[in-house]
């Protein structure tokens, strides 16, 4: 009989109340004011006209496996009412309810029809055919108030990308007309963006009388309360953008060929190279609507650079921040960029090197912030040398509060080119993209920049003092020496009587094949949506219990994220301990069905907290805040006995149409890496649990995500798409890494030894285990061939093991059989299989399944990507 760790009472627990209150306290800081003429915060609650698709249908977070199931979601309508507002627009909101209900009914009918016609499960169609948001009713009359709030919502999710069309990236015709009507007829008009992915703001910026735009994001199950707190000034927004908001979608260099835009979802050519986000906009002098790092607040700040110091080890900037407003407190972010010299390698205009956020400062209050980052982190990747290099020349240090407000603070002079890391190229091109070049382009500049460079503090960096690290790459592992004697157990390993390698040497090939696979039997409806656990219904899967009875090795539970812990909130088991289903496992997993309790049965409850989505958390630029959110999830993992959280997601926001951008942090790899590390440190401060950073790597497209081939240069791969993962590994040592579905340069990432072993383990020192995304090593083409003209095949189980992809999820008998057969025919060395099994069991034995478990990260000497001190 299965053991369940869920509660048997449906009452709201003290933990739920505590965590909801903490999220409400933290999340307001993440919100970003794009525009404000002083209208926000409102002086108090009162009569208000509230419109928009997000008033009653507030989006707490995106869809798919990243959606956290919660007890309740506080809508913005509810939040405003609870704060004392009288909402006058019930008639309009009722009208939109009907518009939305009709659109959703038509969508569901179309899904069912298409699934029947194509003879595929409805869940396959659901994940590929996105719901098209209907336009809103037209506003025709003014209400009896001087204040109007418009809530614009957008949703997206796993399995499909967005579109550059009305009611998606673009605003609908009626949406724009309604906002313009409010701006014309009301004294105060506030637009609240309940979105996690970008929308076009060019037409909005043309509307006269639009007083404030608040990027509220998707803040979890308390979103409505948090928005009300910010609108009334009870919570102070101090977010800064972690993406560039273009004036036109076509301004993004990836726009022409991204995903479905060019009709080809099989091959994605990364012609933008290293010029992603602000690296492109600044270097090619393209003016955005809102630049990277931008964000207003309820007050103003003055930032003054006090000093810059640098040597062969570190670059250190000391700056003072003062609140020069007279009414409201606030927080400011000091952003430090560097401009590397052009040598034999092109460089962007500037790149983020470090950042630090002030404490909450009252009017007139100041604080000194010191930001330090490793000098070697300014290196670029030289494909010809297969090395990271600091090229000779002048490195300008720039300081500001956004990418378009930086000023030159120092000039670091390096006389000789230095190789910081000597490795080897790992990602040979199969069909190399024609990359952008800045040759002949005049970059962004500003009045006085040349004078700042000439007057900047000059610091010489000792070239010879920067040592070269040479990577030693691993070879195919030999078979473990056989341990002769009694059958070893987990207790023997923990006591020191024998080593884990000794125990693994005793396992049969069949046992190791089971260890290297999850316990499910393929990716059925439950597995497809991440619901393959026997011990925590709604969790994504379990590791094997085949070694429990005779060796004392427990199985562990893995659950989805990253916006909280994804479990089924309410489930029922019969007298034999078996879960009772409604007959529709898809709806059961999304908690859509009420199930009767049979005689002798038991109800269980697993209510978890939905924290802000990653894209919103990153806008805080506050690593301690993100760590606290990780701590929230960690406590709930302990309660429900979850060992591995399948999060954080940390792919790069290469293009705003990626359907899963809400799960990821930023267009910048430093921000992404530091946020993921902070989240991981929060989780892994709890004994026996850990994270799985994902999706490794270059998972920047959802359309045809399992079979798309991403063509990327070695340099762009390393500097943009791997750098964040490298930072997270070196500064937090996540317990696991999840490989992505896609191919990179013709090789499935799940089957890439160069990615999973040479880069992650040999170059970065990753110590945990790697797992596949769900269904990676199964043939899933039958589910997607109806929509995509598939060009590439799927990854294989044998090659996963060869690559160092230790755990295949959710697991199926075919995977196990392929592994056993491959060892038998000599195409899979025994030592390689033993090594994969060893890495999995090494983590399992440190999990919370054992009473002696400790915080996983405590065993590592972790680095710091950026160090911040305040005085």
Protein language model regions, located:
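Glycoside hydrolase catalytic-domain context in secreted enzymes
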Residues: 1-381, 389-404, 422-871
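Short beta-strand elements
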Residues: 405-422
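Extracellular/periplasmic metallocenter environments
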Residues: 386
């Amino acid at each position: 009989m299965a053991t369940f760790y869920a509660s048997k009472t449906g009452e709201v627990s003290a933990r739920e109340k505590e965590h909801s209150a903490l999220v409400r306290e933290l999340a307001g800081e993440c919100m970003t004011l794009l525009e404000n003429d002083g209208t926000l915060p409102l002086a108090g609650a009162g009569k208000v006209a509230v419109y928009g698709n997000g008033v009653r249908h507030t989006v707490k977070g995106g869809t798919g496996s990243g959606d956290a199931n919660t007890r309740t979601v506080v809508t913005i309508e509810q939040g405003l009412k609870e704060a004392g507002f009288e909402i006058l627009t019930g008639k309009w909101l009722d009208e939109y309810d009907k518009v939305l209900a009709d659109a959703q009914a038509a969508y569901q009918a179309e899904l069912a029809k298409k699934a029947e016609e194509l003879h595929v499960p409805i869940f396959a169609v659901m994940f590929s055919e996105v719901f098209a948001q209907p336009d809103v009713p037209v506003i025709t009359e003014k209400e009896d108030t001087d204040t109007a709030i418009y809530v614009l919502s957008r949703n997206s999710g796993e399995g499909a990308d967005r579109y550059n069309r009305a009611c998606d990236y673009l605003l609908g015709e009626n949406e724009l007309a309604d906002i313009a009507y409010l701006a014309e007829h009301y004294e105060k008009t506030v637009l609240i963006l309940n979105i996690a992915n970008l929308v076009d703001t060019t037409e909005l910026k043309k509307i006269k009388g639009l007083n404030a735009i608040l990027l509220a994001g998707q803040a979890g199950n308390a979103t409505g309360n948090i928005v009300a707190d910010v609108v009334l000034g009870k919570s102070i927004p101090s977010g800064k953008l972690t993406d560039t908001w273009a004036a036109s979608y076509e301004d993004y260099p990836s726009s022409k060929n991204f995903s479905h835009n060019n009709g080809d979802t099989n091959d994605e050519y990364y012609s933008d190279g290293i010029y992603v986000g602000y690296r492109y906009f600044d270097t090619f002098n393209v003016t955005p609507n809102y630049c990277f790092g931008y964000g207003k607040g309820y007050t103003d700040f003055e930032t003054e650079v006090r000093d810059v110091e640098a040597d062969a080890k570190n670059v250190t900037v000391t700056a003072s921040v003062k609140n020069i407003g007279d009414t409201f407190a606030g927080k400011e972010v000091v952003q430090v960029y560097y401009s590397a010299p052009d040598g034999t390698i092109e460089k962007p205009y500037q790149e983020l090197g470090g950042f630090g956020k002030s404490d909450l400062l009252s009017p007139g209050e100041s604080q000194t912030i010191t930001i330090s980052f490793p000098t070697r982190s300014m290196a670029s990747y030289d494909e010809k040398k297969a090395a990271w290099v600091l090229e000779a020349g002048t490195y300008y240090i720039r300081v500001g509060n956004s990418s378009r407000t930086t000023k030159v603070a120092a000039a670091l002079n390096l006389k000789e080119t230095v190789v910081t890391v000597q490795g080897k190229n790992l990602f040979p091109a199969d069909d190399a993209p024609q990359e952008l070049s800045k040759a002949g382009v005049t970059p962004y500049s500003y009045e006085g920049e040349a004078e700042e460079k000439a007057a900047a503090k000059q610091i010489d960096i000792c070239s010879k003092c920067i040592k070269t690290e040479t990577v030693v790459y691993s070879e195919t592992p030999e078979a473990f020496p056989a341990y002769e004697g009694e059958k070893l157990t987990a207790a023997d390993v923990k006591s020191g009587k024998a080593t884990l390698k000794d125990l693994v040497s005793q396992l049969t090939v069949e046992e190791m094949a089971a260890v290297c696979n999850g316990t499910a039997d393929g990716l059925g409806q439950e597995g497809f949506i991440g619901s393959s656990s026997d011990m925590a219904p709604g969790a994504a899967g379990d590791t094997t219990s085949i070694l429990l009875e005779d060796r004392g090795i427990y199985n562990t539970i893995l659950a989805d994220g990253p916006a909280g812990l994804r479990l089924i909130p309410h489930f029922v088991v019969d007298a034999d301990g078996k879960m009772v289903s409604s007959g529709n496992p898809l709806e059961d997993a999304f908690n859509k069905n009420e199930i009767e309790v049979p005689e002798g049965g038991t109800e269980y409850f697993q209510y978890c907290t939905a924290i802000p989505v990653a894209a919103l958390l990153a806008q805080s630029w506050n690593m301690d805040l993100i760590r606290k959110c990780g701590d929230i999830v960690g406590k709930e993992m302990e309660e429900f006995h979850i060992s591995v959280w399948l999060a954080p997601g940390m792919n790069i926001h290469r293009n705003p149409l990626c359907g899963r951008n809400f799960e990821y942090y930023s267009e910048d790899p430093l921000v992404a890496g530091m946020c993921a590390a902070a989240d991981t440190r929060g989780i892994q401060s709890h004994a026996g649990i850990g994270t799985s950073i994902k999706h490794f790597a270059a998972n920047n497209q959802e359309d045809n995500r399992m079979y798309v081939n991403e063509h990327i240069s070695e340099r762009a791969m390393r500097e943009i798409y791997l750098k964040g993962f490298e930072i997270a590994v070196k500064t937090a040592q996540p317990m696991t890494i999840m490989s992505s579905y896609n191919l990179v340069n013709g090789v499935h990432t799940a089957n890439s030894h160069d990615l999973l072993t040479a880069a992650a383990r040999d170059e970065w020192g990753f110590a945990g285990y790697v797992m596949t995304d769900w269904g990676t090593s199964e043939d899933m083409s039958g589910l997607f061939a109806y929509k995509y003209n598939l060009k590439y095949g799927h990854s294989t189980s044998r090659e996963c093991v060869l690559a160092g992809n230790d755990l295949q999820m959710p697991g199926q008998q075919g995977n196990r059989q392929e592994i056993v057969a491959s060892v038998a025919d000599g195409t899979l060395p025994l030592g390689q299989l033993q090594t994969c099994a060893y890495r999995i069991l090494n983590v399992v034995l440190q999990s919370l399944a054992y009473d002696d478990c400790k915080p996983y990260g405590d065993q590592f000497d972790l680095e710091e990507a950026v160090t911040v001190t305040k005085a």
